[in-house]
């Protein structure tokens, strides 16, 4: 269609050109005639982001097919850094560039993503941008796949493709599990101070709306929908909680909308996506629900162990934003429950 429209325009233009040269007065309009301009057809190619009927599964970030990634969101540093700046420590490099160099997963909603124009980039990118603005700095993001087969810290994993190559000074989107030294130590990465918690939260609808805790679920023998192969499904197995598993959080939400289950435990980060993609759902997170200790984890960022000054810069910024409530406001704006860090 595009080429047809283009060819038609060219043919018309070429056919009119000689006439214009030979008899310009014949083509000109009289002073009394209204001047009407007809715009040329224009075709813009892109994703159809209009309303959709039914439920569309959340997008999966795939670099080989994602047009935004292929158009420039690559695994290389987004700004030029000189050899001299490369030899600086992270804090001096940040000041010299006027920019914080950060890495994050290209599709980890609601935390980070390769954002389109006028669309939110993710709550962690917003937090970083707020830190930068307070110090008259910019941010530049490098997108990296954090879900590599043997973990982000394994050989060939996300750290090897980003911070270990000196392409960024901080990695967003990390969860402190307490058993991840094998991911951090080989790359000499340490965590920043945690700035929030995530965890599995209780979601109910219909006849299950009176439930307020996992004890209620167990005592009343209500079947829970759970994501398969998750810490929550392991916990349910070990504690005799009746449940049915579904592959990934969004399929648990599907099961609730379809009436297969009326109660579920899903990761708190999935609440935001569920509200966007299943607006017809009647499910709600139990008001005031706090994840049980075994099913909640701190969120933090990763930095090189040697970057003591830069770590203090980030930690101090978190302290200030936690005290003012700014992080809580950002998180809740994304439709996700906010839980303060444990530490």
Region locations from a protein language model:
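Bilobed "Venus flytrap"/periplasmic-binding protein-like clamshell domains
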Residues: 107-109, 118-137, 199-252, 268-270
């Amino acid at each position: 269609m595009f080429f047809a429209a283009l060819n038609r325009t060219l043919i018309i233009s070429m056919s009119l050109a000689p006439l214009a040269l030979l008899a310009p007065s014949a083509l000109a309009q009289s002073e009394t005639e209204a001047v009407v301009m007809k715009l040329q057809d224009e075709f813009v190619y892109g994703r159809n982001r209009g309303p959709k009927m039914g439920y569309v599964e959340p997008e999966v970030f795939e670099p080989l097919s994602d047009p935004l990634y292929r158009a420039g969101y690559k695994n290389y540093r987004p700004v030029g850094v000189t050899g001299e700046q490369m030899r600086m420590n992270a804090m001096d490099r940040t000041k010299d560039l006027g920019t914080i160099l950060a890495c994050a997963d290209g599709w980890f909603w609601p935390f980070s993503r390769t954002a389109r124009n006028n669309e939110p980039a993710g709550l962690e990118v917003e937090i970083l941008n707020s830190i930068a603005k307070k110090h008259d700095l910019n941010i530049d993001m490098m997108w990296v796949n954090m879900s590599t087969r043997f973990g982000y810290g394994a050989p060939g994993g996300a750290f090897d493709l980003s911070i270990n190559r000196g392409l960024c000074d901080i990695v967003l989107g990390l969860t402190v599990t307490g058993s991840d030294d094998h991911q951090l130590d080989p790359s000499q990465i340490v965590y920043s101070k945690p700035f929030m918690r995530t965890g599995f939260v209780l979601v109910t609808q219909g006849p299950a709306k009176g439930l307020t805790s996992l004890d209620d679920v167990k005592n009343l023998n209500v079947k829970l929908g759970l994501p398969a192969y998750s810490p929550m499904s392991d916990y349910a197995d070990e504690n005799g909680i009746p449940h049915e598993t579904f592959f990934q959080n969004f399929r648990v939400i599907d099961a609730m909308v379809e009436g297969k289950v009326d109660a579920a435990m899903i990761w708190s980060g999935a609440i935001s996506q569920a509200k966007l993609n299943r607006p017809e759902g009647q499910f709600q997170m139990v008001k005031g629900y706090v994840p049980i200790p075994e099913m909640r984890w701190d969120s933090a960022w990763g930095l090189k162990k040697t970057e003591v000054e830069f770590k203090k810069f980030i930690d101090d910024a978190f302290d200030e934003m936690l005290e003012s409530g700014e992080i809580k406001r950002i998180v809740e704006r994304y439709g996700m429950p906010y839980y303060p860090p444990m530490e």
